[in-house]
Amino acid sequence: MINGTFYYEEDKTMKRKTVVALLAASMILSMAMPAAASDSTEESTEVTTEAATEAAAEADASQPITKAEDLDPAIAATTAETTQELPLVANEGDASFSMFVDDSSATGEFVMMDELKKQTNVDVELRLFPYETATERLNLDLNSGDYADVIAGWTLSDSLILNYGVNQGVFVPLEEYFEKSCPKITEILNLKGVREKMTAPDGHIYSIPYVVEDDLVGYTPYINGQWLENLGLEMPTTTDEFEAVLQAFKDQDANGNGDTTDEIPFSTDPNNKHIEAMAGYFGMPMNKKGLAIVDGETVYGGVSSKYREFLSWFSGMYQKGLIDTELYTQDSSTWEGKGSRDLYGVSIAYGSNEFSGIARGPEKSVWDVLPVLNTENGGIWLRDTSGFSVYRTQVVVTDNAEDPELICRWFDNAFSLENGIGISTGPVGTIVTKEDDGYHVIDKSTLSEEDQEKYSWANLWPQAVSKYMPAGFRLVEANPDYDEKAAVEKIYEPNMTEGVIEENWIDMGSIDTYADISTAIKDYFEQQQAMFVAGEQDINDDATWQAYVDGMYALGLEDWLSIQGISTIAE
């Protein structure tokens, strides 16, 4: 129970990229979330304005900024301690609101939710559902009218905001509350490019902003370096070499446990498979929607010959037993469980710790990022962000809320600098201390096992919910964790697309059409991909492939792309 009734649907566990994708436990990323993550439902938009790009670049190029006053003035303006008069209500229990969020917490206990209750006297009734079931549950709630006061997390999308906000009024406009009572959120909206990205086609802002200094690349394949060493293998650089490595993993006792049959050469995050990204090895760097960047232009690659070439290669490996047979059926806990038993040679993930069972620490683990393959023949990886993103579909307030203004003020207080530090790293005064030269993180290894778990990143805050840290701001760490994402970016940077795929609001007159076609195309793309990979449909049969292509067009592919301003379908 947290600040009221605790709802939790017992199901598969999940560590959201996003959650993990945006903020590593040992790093304080800007304007803090995500994964990127990219994932199947999140809507992130790139702030590609010159000012935003330069701010992110300067943050990386200079010495770490550990004092807020040393930040760029526009960003520094967002770092003042709370401008809310606390507590928000006179007595504990005088006010409350409910919040639906996708999160796989086993206990529902979050350190900073308790801290915010102490600060505000506002009870928050969390309704937590694992991501695997959250979308279905949210749809049921919205259809029944029995939805929470606040809906948060990766289940939201532009389509939902346009439908339930612009069209139906279930999600309420928030900009008047921001201007009246939320000076910190207002300063965040005033950062260059943010307000424009947050504003829906009808001129309203329907969500709490989530602005983040983002990773250039989210999900990538990680390869077990210890297995390579055990078998005397080199890091592969081509798809042929990669397949040969996977075959060796399968045929030999790569994990050294004496059993030559338990190795699983390749797997991926069940909820963020991202296998289509590997079409980039064949010159078609794609995202989960089938969109790609070719020669600097956003195109649709989901019916292209290069995507088919990738599917043929990947399906061939599946038929040879090199791919996890549970690729399309396992849940997160199964994936993580197999990884923690050292059964994987390669897995796609946001970070290797998501599945390996190896905790972050100052030393690099045995896992290496797999480099982009076939680079000498046009292999390229899709750049996810330019280093700075606005997530505009993370938190909405519904018409069931009795006091939307109070909810906005609660978030405005949560966005204070020290609350942001607490949400991302740990409470100031417990895990972080304020010194003359900035905020210092204690060595968490000195904590008891119980406290290490209590103050772990996942237990600080339901991390799918909006939070904020200023761009470029860093904590002082005497013994920082190994920065795996920085290593990924260093390896991938030379072989990534220069541009990113932009997400734009849909024209008001096209909302219903877009929503209907989007669902149909997404489902068809994913279902057909699974059937091709598993061999239920022959990817190498021309008639079968043409039937797939014809089916995509029949669903309205051209209209779907036109609504998004995309004119090219790669052949």
Model-predicted regions and their roles:
Residues 163, 269-289, 315-466:
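Extracytoplasmic/periplasmic substrate-binding proteins
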